[in-house]
Swiss-Prot record:
Its cofactor is FMN. InterPro entries: Aldolase_TIM, NMO. Pfam families: NMO. Nitronate monooxygenase; part of the gene cluster that mediates the biosynthesis of the deadly neurotoxic nitroalkane 3-nitropropanoic acid (3-NPA) that acts as an antimetabolite of succinate and irreversibly inhibits succinate dehydrogenase and disrupts mitochondrial oxidative phosphorylation. Catalyzes the oxidation of 3-NPA to nitrite and malonic semialdehyde. It comes from Metarhizium robertsii (strain ARSEF 23 / ATCC MYA-3075) (Metarhizium anisopliae (strain ARSEF 23)). Belongs to the nitronate monooxygenase family. NMO class I subfamily. This is Nitronate monooxygenase npaC.
Amino acid sequence: MTALLRNECKQALAKSLPWTKSPLVISAPMRVMTGPGLAVAVSSAGGLGFLGPTLKPEDVFADLDKAAELLGSSPIQGAAGPSLLPIGVGFQTWNGDLEVAVSAVTKHRPCAVWLFAPRRGQAELNEWTAAIRSASPDTRVWLQVGSLGEAVEAAASATPPDVLVLQGAEGGGHGRHRDAQGTIALVPEVSDALGHSGIPLVAAGGIVDGRGAAAALTLGAAGVAMGTRFLASSEARISKGYQDEVVRASDGAKNTVRTQLYNHLRGTFGWPEPFSPRTLINRSWRDHEAGVEFDRLKELHDESAKTGDAGWGPEGRLATYVGAAVGLVRRVDDAAVIVRETRDQARAILTSVVAHL
């Protein structure tokens, strides 16, 4: 993809999100943890906030209702228009309910829908994309992928996405555990491979501040999506024990692992084979590595869950899903502060680099 086409893609994305400021900062749709308060706060600060998938598919209605209420009391100047909510909503397609999703999108018309994790590959994504576009033609469909092959297949499909989110191996969300590629290699390789497709690219995975954002922009991204950094926001819908761990942790390469263990301990089974999440290592993982049987691990996990915030931490047993860059997250801030600081730092870095060439 040429520099001229990359700029055209950025401009097209910005035009579809007229209230946003450049560079575009996005809060990723983390399951349950990114609720209405966080999504609206990010969009209100000139970014794009996404609601995460909900525990039950039908719970998305309550989240969208609340987001609409918040936006009604504090409208965002320059929003996409009266017919579109200036937030997005994410769906895991493998265990999502397409009928519920279509109903929710029809009612609230979010500006974007983020699709991820199909069980049946691109065919499943084609079904969801076509249904979403039929329900709300002005809603943009974002598709998260983690490999070059997925990106090329999506771009050449019968229903190519409006935006491709490229999740590098550093990400904390469920990503490809066997053929994942780091963000710094994935973004430019996809950009080159797609050539003149005209699909804007959003970088995700390992980005928690303006330094990562600046790097992603130079690689060809039109914006950046952050998950772990927004876990340390005052609006995040998570327990204090979880959030304390996000701020405390360091050395993500050493202290995190990709595994389905914590999903299973929490009673979540059935994720498609290519995917696994990244979590902080604690007693559950160390005991698993030592050969403790799953049934015993489950008992200890469930006992730990009854202790509240003490269930997290190096000696805890509960899941703390984070990205490899967790060591760069050092404090809790309001979401608006995170958006502004990331944007301003990225601008300053890029300006400085150009000035010194």
